[in-house]
Amino acid sequence: MKFSLTLILSCLIIFISSCSMSQRRDFVEPDINLKIKTTNKNKEIIIQSLLKDGDIFSISFGDEDSYVLANNILNSDLKYFCKSLVEEEREVLEKNIFKSKKDVNKKVIVVFSENYENIASFLKNKYPEEEYFMIMPEDFDTQIKEILNVDLSIENYNDLSKFDTSLKISHSPRIRDDIGSIYYITDYDVGKTIVPIFRSYALNMDTFSSSEIFHDANDIKKLVDFENTYIPITKKMIENISKKQDPLIKSEIENSLIRDFLIIEKVFQNNLFRENLLPISGNIKIKRSGCIDRNLNLWKVSTADFTD
């Protein structure tokens, strides 16, 4: 069930006023005190999360010394974490794809859409020996055939068939044999189309992407388009997405990140470090000193667990 921010704030104001009028002496110390500057969207998520958890809380959205919670949570350095979620995902991918290549004699194929050109350029400067292809929003199949050299395999088959038209030859187009893995850097609109095409030609190829590739999907079952692709994300986050009530997967990930912030804030304010709590977005226990590295593992996309 969702509540409007105006309704929630109005109810809170009425509640606080009634407490003041009755001059309660049995004041209960809040579980969490918050001073935050953020957008209305984030305010609503914060209040809904606190109410859902049944926490006693004190919250202010207007103080000058408040913590600023950026609207773009996915790409911002959330309090207590070393880096943004997207940045950590990309670093995990870089380590697994480039720095820990299974076969140094084979190439990584980086396929990116135009709005991710800066990220591809950054990687190209670091790893110039790999191959980089900007995918254009037209005739995807032809572009992918060219990248994988599928056209050459088909041409060879056609040439062979000309020698004897009565000869029946079974032919499955082969891709080039110097590819070790494929790294997709695209959004959902492009990814949902190109990944199945690549998979149809390179079925057993290791493929990778950040979670950005399915952020704009509205149902976890839509991840079938990315079956067997490696994504750096926690099991708990996937479970949350599978139970989501928001229209987009991206919204549920944002909700989980805000819940992480609230959980960690509560741990610090109440000295709950012995509880050994894990954030939703990471695999490292909440610690007192230093920033939190999420220590993400790669999840191989499998929709089998989420189909009816």
Where in the sequence are the language-model features?
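Extracytosolic ligand-binding ectodomains
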Residues: 2-10, 18-308
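Conserved P-loop NTPase catalytic core
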Residues: 13
